């Protein structure tokens, strides 16, 4: 934890400097590689970790080495991870998907914005200094057309996005030749389908079945295609966003870039303070990953924070505003029904979801059904016109382990399953949000209930936190639950930072939350038996046993922390080649002793073999050549 707290001015200045000096940066001893597909422009980025050779013998003067293969890994950093690409936040990222969108011929540019709020913001000269300068002309589906990846998948069309994803999900494992690295324990997949090789047709089939989604708004062409589904790698979401009391546009863009560097597969902008519209534009134009929002937050701002004053018209305008900016998925709390609210009365912690509490208050004050539920088909029509995926929010999720798996939670979940079928009628992609706070023994039921009642739509959970006693460490309490539910089939995990329940996370908190959740997601992939998931573990173990310290650092999820911890006690360069670490020292290093035992055993085997041959030679009379019948 930092010893000195920066002032607000210092934080903004630091963020501005980060943006102004931003350039493509590779991780230590890594390089950016691209694997091309058959569709024009399909060029899938990955990070390749270069490894040093293994000493296998020879003399001090003439050592003999064996090369170690480079390890390809999934990379969410987009252009920010390529030192060859010039970064200019003022201009935004290259529009990777624009040619693919245009080639389909089913969209049209809008001459005027559909949202009244957007029109008002654009007409306000006072916002010129805050506004992103390179605004896109938004597109929407032509009349009578649907432009969703689900629609294409159901038509049997393999889009460039699907091919991109197939290559990306395979993680370049076909490049690995070593049997040691390719070895993998069988997993327990709990019914997940995990093919040895992911093809574009498999991606299409999973999307068509509703088991996976590709969040890819036609107005966010900068994003690199990714997929969320239990038959693919477990994904991680990072939340960012300003509030009424802290953070700025510069800081949120900095957090976006930082999040993608540390492995965020998607980012949710949960801004609730001033300049929500302008902040979101900067984020979208500079984001290589899908961006999600909770539109009710901004709709509430438009009615001065008074939940009772919310209207369908204000909410609809917000959906159009955000869809035309390029938001890839909306969290919609349409399952918080009026009749479910009394079910929460006996809870220890009531309704803890911000969106859920807003809708519950609206329902009670008007004594009417949730307007999101009532207008759900209209919501789907909007989403189908821009390919905005729906993340059906768990507004009644438990906020404490005491409230886990209660009547209200599962009543809402069943309603989300009904809404999923409605969304699919409109070819709208859907995932389901889940808890929350759930003790370990109760976690699996959440997954089985979701699969049964939500028709195998992807599950997306916040943790869950497995205990409530550790404020300041809730990235850890939730990481346990995240690893478990990821193993059981959860498709995406929403990270929790050390600041959960305590305050708005800063840059370092974002990193800590992401590293924790990348560990959880990877552990789940290993447990499921996702093909190739163990390659990096095997490479790390081999480097560890061979005392290749630099490779150990570079294979780590966080190379900088691994190196820093090592250097606290062995800072000299000689420590990077030592056959021990400071924990056991040179005489008691288990791996060094193990190597000596293995070498000794190998030598003993040779000696015993030679002795046996010698005895056999003497028993046959000591003749060099034997007659054929004696041989």
UniProtKB/Swiss-Prot annotation:
Disulfide bonds: none annotated. It holds the Pfam family ThiC-associated. One of its GO terms (biological process) is thiamine biosynthetic process. One of its GO terms (molecular function) is carbon-carbon lyase activity. [4Fe-4S] cluster binds at residues 581, 584, 589. Gene3D superfamilies: 6.10.250.620, Radical SAM ThiC family, central domain. Its cofactor is [4Fe-4S] cluster. It catalyses: 5-amino-1-(5-phospho-beta-D-ribosyl)imidazole + S-adenosyl-L-methionine = 4-amino-2-methyl-5-(phosphooxymethyl)pyrimidine + CO + 5'-deoxyadenosine + formate + L-methionine + 3 H(+). Keywords: 4Fe-4S, Iron, Iron-sulfur, Lyase, Metal-binding, S-adenosyl-L-methionine, Thiamine biosynthesis, Zinc. GO terms for cellular component: cytosol. Binds 1 [4Fe-4S] cluster per subunit. The cluster is coordinated with 3 cysteines and an exchangeable S-adenosyl-L-methionine. Pathway: Cofactor biosynthesis; thiamine diphosphate biosynthesis. It comes from the Bacteria. InterPro entries: ThiC, ThiC-associated_dom, ThiC/Bza_core_dom, ThiC/BzaA/B. Substrate binds at residues 239, 268, 297, 333, 353-355, 394-397, 433, 460. Zn(2+) binds at residues 437, 501. Its EC number is 4.1.99.17. Belongs to the ThiC family. Catalyzes the synthesis of the hydroxymethylpyrimidine phosphate (HMP-P) moiety of thiamine from aminoimidazole ribotide (AIR) in a radical S-adenosyl-L-methionine (SAM)-dependent reaction. Homodimer. PANTHER family: PHOSPHOMETHYLPYRIMIDINE SYNTHASE, CHLOROPLASTIC, THIAMINE BIOSYNTHESIS PROTEIN THIC. This is Phosphomethylpyrimidine synthase. The gene is thiC.
């Amino acid at each position: 934890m930092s010893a000195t707290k920066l002032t607000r001015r210092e934080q903004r200045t630091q963020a501005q400097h980060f943006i102004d000096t931003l350039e493509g940066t590779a991780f230590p001893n890594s390089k950016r590689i691209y694997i091309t597909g058959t569709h024009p422009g399909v060029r899938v980025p990955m990070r390749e970790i270069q490894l040093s050779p293994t000493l296998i013998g020879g003399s001090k003067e003439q050592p003999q080495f064996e090369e170690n293969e480079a390890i390809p890994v999934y990379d969410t950093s987009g252009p920010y991870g390529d030192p060859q690409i010039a970064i200019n936040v003022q201009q935004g990222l290259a529009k990777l998907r624009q040619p693919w969108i245009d080639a389909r011929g089913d969209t049209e540019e809008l001459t005027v914005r559909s949202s009244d709020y957007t029109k008002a913001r654009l007409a306000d000269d006072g916002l010129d200094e805050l506004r992103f300068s390179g605004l896109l002309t938004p597109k929407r589906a032509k009349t009578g057309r649907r432009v969703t990846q689900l629609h294409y998948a159901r038509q049997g069309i393999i889009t460039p996005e699907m091919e991109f994803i197939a290559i990306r999900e395979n993680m370049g494992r076909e490049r690995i030749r070593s049997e040691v690295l390719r070895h993998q324990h069988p997993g327990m997949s709990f019914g997940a389908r995990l093919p040895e090789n992911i093809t574009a047709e498999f991606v299409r089939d999973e999307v068509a079945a509703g088991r996976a989604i590709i969040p890819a708004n036609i107005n966010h062409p900068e994003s690199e295609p990714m997929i969320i589904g239990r038959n693919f790698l477990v994904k991680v979401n990072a939340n960012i966003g300003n509030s009424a009391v802290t953070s700025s546009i510069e800081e949120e863009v900095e957090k976006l870039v930082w999040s993608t560097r540390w492995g965020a597969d998607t980012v949710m902008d949960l801004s609730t303070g001033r300049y929500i519209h302008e902040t979101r534009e900067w984020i979208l134009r500079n984001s290589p990953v899908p961006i999600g929002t909770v539109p009710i937050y901004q709709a509430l701002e438009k009615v001065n924070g008074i939940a009772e004053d919310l209207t369908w018209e204000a909410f609809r305008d917000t959906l159009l505003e955000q869809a035309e900016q390029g938001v890839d998925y909306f969290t919609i709390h349409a399952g918080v029904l009026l009749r479910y609210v009394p079910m929460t009365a006996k809870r220890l912690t009531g309704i803890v979801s911000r969106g859920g509490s807003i809708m519950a208050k609206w329902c009670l004050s008007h004594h009417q059904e949730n307007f999101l539920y009532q207008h759900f088909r209209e919501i789907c029509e909007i989403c189908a016109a821009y390919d905005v995926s729906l993340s059906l929010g768990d507004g009644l999720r438990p906020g404490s382990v005491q409230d886990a798996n209660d009547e209200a939670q599962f009543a809402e979940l069943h309603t989300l399953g009904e809404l999923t079928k409605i969304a699919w009628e409109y070819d709208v992609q859907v995932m389901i949000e889940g808890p929350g706070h759930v003790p370990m023994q109760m976690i699996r039921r959440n997954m089985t209930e979701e699969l049964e009642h939500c028709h195998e739509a992807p599950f997306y959970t916040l943790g869950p936190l497995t205990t409530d006693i550790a404020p300041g460490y809730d990235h850890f309490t939730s990481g346990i639950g995240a690893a478990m539910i990821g193993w059981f089939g959860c498709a995406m995990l929403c990270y929790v930072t050390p600041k959960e329940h305590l305050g708005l996370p800063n840059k370092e908190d974002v990193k800590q939350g992401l590293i924790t959740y990348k560990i959880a997601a990877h552990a789940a992939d290993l447990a499921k038996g996702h093909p190739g998931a163990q390659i990096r573990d095997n490479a790390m173990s081999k480097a560890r046993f061979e005392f290749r310290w630099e490779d150990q650092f570079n294979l780590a999820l966080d190379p900088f922390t691994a190196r820093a911890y090592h250097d606290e006690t062995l800072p000299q360069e000689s420590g990077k080649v030592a056959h021990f670490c400071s924990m056991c020292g040179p005489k008691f290093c288990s791996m060094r002793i193990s190597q000596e035992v293995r070498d000794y055993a190998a030598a003993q085997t040779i000696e015993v073999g030679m002795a046996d041959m010698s005895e056999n030679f003497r028993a046959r009379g000591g003749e060099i050549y034997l007659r054929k019948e004696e041989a």
